[in-house]
Amino acid sequence: MKKNDRSNKMYLEDIQLAMSRIAEYTTGLDFDHFKKDYKTVDAVIRNFEIIGEAAKRVDDQIKQMYPDIPWEEMYYLRNRVSHEYFGIDYEIIWDVASNYLPQNKLQIDEIIEKEITDY
């Protein structure tokens, strides 16, 4: 499958799944435990990469309909974690995962439920 063969629905489902995985990986952890658990850190970072790449590929029409979703910030975070190999700030990763992702996931769930048919 070529990149352009994927639909908005697929990209949104990628975002939804990655957000669910981050929530699953971090449930029950505090920041100190998170930053010491390199497997969890790596898994969370990988899923932020997926979120950002998928967010970049969602059609502008959908993004304009839902301007409260931080589409650009999702991609920006993806770039930060993908290219700053040794300079990743775990506090930022933790903050986004624990304070912003739950609401963002609800927003993505809403888009999938309301808008997506055969995009």
Predicted regions and their residues:
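Solvent-exposed interaction patches of small proteins and small membrane subunits
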Residues: 1-119
